[in-house]
Amino acid sequence: MRTMHLAAAVASALTLSTSASAGFFDLTLAPYVGGSLGQATSDISCPVGISCDDSDTAWKIYGGLEINEYISMEVGYIDLGESTFTGTQSGTRETNGMTTAVVGTYAISPSFILSGRGGMNFLNTEVNGTIAGTSTQNTGDTDVVWSFGVGAQYNLTPAVGLRLDWERFFETGSSNFNGGTGEADIDLFSAGVVYKF
C-alpha cells in the first residue's frame, strides 16, 4: 500500500512538472504594442551654487512579442523628460532614446499579470545651458544604459490591458557635471495601455 501511495505521488509530481514544462515551451508568438505616460525623477547631484529640479513628465511607446506565457521581448522609444538647473549655471538636462527589454510575466489570474524586466537601452543625454551668463553651450553623451523594473497589468479584454510600471535606468550621462552631462540614475513611474494582436 505504501508503495502504491509513493508511486501515485511520483506520478502526480511528474504530471505537474510536465504540465509546467509544456506551458514554458508552448510558443504563443503574439505581437503587441503599447504606450505609457508618467513621471521621471533623476538623482543627479548638483554642484554648490546650482539648484536642480529633477522631476518631469516622461513617456514611452513600444512593441513586443510574447514568446510564451512567461517571457516577452520589447523594443521601444522613451523620453525621460528633462531636469532643469539654475544658479551659476542654468539650463536643462534631458535623456531619451531606444529601449530593449526581456520581460518575465506571471499570471495571478487571466486578468491580472505581474511582470519583471531587464533592459539594455541606447540613451542620449544632452545638456543645454549657460555658465555665468556666457553663450549657450551644448553637451551630449550617448551610452548603453542598463535598466530594471517591475509592474502589473490588468486585462480589460483578451486584447486590451492597462499597465503600471516602475523602472530604473542606471548611470545615464557622463560622470562630470562641469563640462559634461552629469551622471544620474532615473526612476520612471508610468501608466499606459497595451494592445495584443
Q: Which role fits each region the language model picked out?
A:
Residues 24-30, 48-50, 170, 179:
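Short, aromatic- and cysteine-enriched interfacial helices/patches
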Residues 1-29:
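Cleavable N-terminal export/targeting peptides
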Residues 82-84, 138, 148, 154-197:
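Predominantly the C-terminal beta-signal and adjacent terminal strand-loop region
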Residues 120, 144, 168:
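A short beta-strand motif that forms part of the nucleic acid-binding face
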Residues 108, 112-114, 133-137, 141-143, ...:
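Outer-membrane beta-barrel porins/channels
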Residues 23-30, 34-43, 59-133, 154, ...:
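Gram-negative (and chloroplast) outer-membrane scaffold detector with strong preference
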